[in-house]
Amino acid sequence: MKRNFDSVKRLVIKIGTSSLVLPSGKINLEKIDQLAFVISSLHNKGIEVVLVSSGAMGFGLNVLDLETRPAEVGKQQAVSSVGQVAMMSLYSQVFSHYQTKVSQLLLTRDVVEYPESLANAINAFESLFELGVVPIVNENDAVSVDEMDHATKFGDNDRLSAIVAKVVGADLLIMLSDIDGLFDKNPNVYEDATLRSYVPEITEEILASAGAAGSKFGTGGMMSKIKSAQMVFENQSQMVLMNGENPRDILRVLEGAKIGTLFKQED
């Protein structure tokens, strides 16, 4: 299927913790700089971009020099609150190199479930777009409790990115991950696994091919990405799942390159 994203004027990009934090726990500064360059380039072309960024836990572990994610909910929230400050500080610094202004929006599930607070959130996004600001969104881990096993959480930032795409009326959601896209079976187990370039619907076969996942820094897996694609379909939008190793590939995707997996219902 030929890809054409010429009509995309509003875009949500989701980046996961594994793309921001190295296996050693150190912050991937080079990748963050590339991401800021790409988003700034799109912004300069008149495309409105929202960045949904995980990473608060990973940044917090780095700042506090902790090797493992705490088991206790309160400590998880504390580490995330420390990490969120560090992450936004770095984003603000890096984006400023490209003369791009950013803001922070921390959401909880109840914000989008109640009409009044949802309207306020929409107004905030629209006002930021009018001001030429790139909103950076994360879940408010310091006060949310259900991803951390307890119900004000979205579940993970894959789901959050799909919800944000709906809230802002995005033309496209690009989800950056540590895999190349959706395969017909687990590529870490089967050498003959084949990348699916195009998915027009979420079938039982596709659901069955989604395995478990998550790193010590993050929470998302393939199943959460499939469920996010289902939400995107329900909102009559589209999603690309691609490897976040080289953020500049986002520009190639928007030019029509067949990178990753395109989730798009047939016209």
Curated annotation (Swiss-Prot):
Q: Provide one Gene Ontology biological process annotation.
A: L-proline biosynthetic process
Q: What Pfam families has UniProt attached to this entry?
A: AA_kinase
Give the main EC class: transferase
Record's keyword annotation contains Transport: no
Which positions does UniProt annotate for ATP binding?
K14, S177, D178, T219, G220, G221, M222, M223, S224, K225
Annotated GO MF terms? ATP binding; glutamate 5-kinase activity
**Keyword terms:** Amino-acid biosynthesis, ATP-binding, Cytoplasm, Kinase, Nucleotide-binding, Proline biosynthesis, Transferase
Gene Ontology, cellular component aspect:
cytosol
Catalytic activity of the protein: L-glutamate + ATP = L-glutamyl 5-phosphate + ADP
Where do the annotations place substrate binding?
Answer: S54, D141, N157
EC number from the UniProt entry: 2.7.2.11
Q: Which family does it belong to?
A: Belongs to the glutamate 5-kinase family.
State the protein's name. Answer: Glutamate 5-kinase
Q: Which organism is it from?
A: Streptococcus thermophilus (strain ATCC BAA-250 / LMG 18311)
